[in-house]
C-alpha cells in the first residue's frame, strides 16, 4: 500500500471509530434508531435477526418494567411494573393501558421493596400465572384474561413451612408443572431482611397436584428461567453481581434435575460491557436459541452456550423479553420503557 492510500485508510478508520463513539454516546430516544442496534457474532445469526431490525418504544415512564408475556388469544402483551404493583397491557392499534392493580402485593400495610408482580406466564390452560414479589407467592389470576380482576389463587407460598424470598420468574410445562426462581430481590433489606425465612435462594417446582419441591439451591441470585421445547432441559440465569452465568440442567421424567451446570459464563462479557448487568429474564425461539437480558441488552445464545448476537440497547438495563405468536416481533422490557423489535422488517 502506498503512503497516500495508507493515509486515506487511516483517516477513514479514525472517522469510523469517532462515528461509532458518537453513536454509542447518543441518548436513548423513543421511536427512532437511537434506541439500539444489532451486533451479530456468528454467521448463523443472519437467519435469526436482520441487521436492520426495527426498534420501536411502545410504552414509557415506568419505574421498572419486567416479566413480559404474550397472550395469543388476545393478541396482546402483558408486562409488570414491579415497584408500582401494576400490570400493563399493550395491543397494536390501541397502545398501552393499565391492566391490573394490585398485581403482586395485596395487603394494605405499607411495605418497602419490590412489591408488584414480576415474572408472568401462561399455564397449559391459558391462565395467567404470576410471581408475586410483595406477597412472596406464586399465584394464578382467577378472572378471565379479557376481564381481569385482582383476585388470585395461591399456588405456592412456602417451602417446608418457610416463606419464599420473593418469587421472580416462572415457566409452566405442558403438564401444568411450574418451575420458578426465588432470589432475595423483593425483600426490602435483601439478604439481611428480618422477615427472610429461607437460608438460600432456590429454583423450585410446583407439581400439577400442588406439591412444591426444591430443585436447586446452589445458584446465587437465580433469575430468568425457561424450558426447552421437549421439556428435557431447564435453563436458569444467575444475575449474581460478580459472576453472572446461564445454567442448563437435564430433567428426568419426574421433572427433577439429574445433571447439568454452567452453559455460559458472562463474567468477562459483563466486565467489557457498557451496561454492566447480570443475566436476567429470557425466552427461547423455535429452534432453541436463548434470547436473554444481560450485559448490554438482549444476548442471543445457542443451546450449546455460544453467544451468537447481541440486541444492544443503549443506556438502559434490560430485564426480560417475549415473542409474539409467530415470533416476528420481540418485546423487550428495559428499565422505564418497553421496546417492540421487528426481527425481520419488510
PLM regions: where:
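Bacterial Sec-dependent N-terminal signal peptides
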Residues: 1-25
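Sequence-structural signature of mature extracellular/luminal beta-sheet repeat domains
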Residues: 18-346
